[in-house]
Amino acid sequence: KCNAAGEPNVIFLETELAREFGEGCRVICPITDPYVVHHGALGSAVTVYLPDGVDERAVADWIAALDGVTEVHTRESAMAKLELPGDRIGDLFVLSARDWVIGRTPEHHDLSKLEDTLRSHGGRYEEMVPFLISEPLNSRYAALAKGDPRNFDIFDFVCNGIQS
C-alpha cells in the first residue's frame, strides 16, 4: 500500500470529489475501527453517497479514471457482483488497486500513528484467504474447493464437508 519510497499511496476520495464536483459527496470507509497503527482507518473499499442532482455515471467514470482505482460499481452492480447488501452501501462502491488505499479526507486519517508499512482490508487483493482444514474433504466439498470458496464458507466446509 506504499510507493517505492515507503510513503502511503492514498486517494483521499472525498477531498478529490469536492474539488471536482463540489461539496456534498460523502465517502464512508468501512474499516473505521479504532486500531489504526496498521491501516490508518484507510481501506481498499469505500462507499460513496452522492447528493441529489449529481450525475452518478459522470462521477463513477471520473473515479474510475483515478490512479489507484480498479473498480467502481453502482449500488445495483455491487449488489449483483460483490454480493453486498444494497441497504448498507451508498450510490457507488469503489475498490482500490493492490498497492493503494482510499480514505475520506486527510483530516479524517491520522497517518502519524502508523507504526510500520500500511496494510488494508476489503479489496479484491485481500479476498484470497487460504482454507486450512485438518481433515480430508468429502468428494462434494473437494470439488467445491476447486472453485471459488469465500472466507465465510469455511463453516459449511468444516461442518458438512469433512470425510466421515
Residues covered by each model-derived region:
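Feature captures the catalytic ectodomains and active-site-proximal regions of enzymes
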Residues: K1-S164
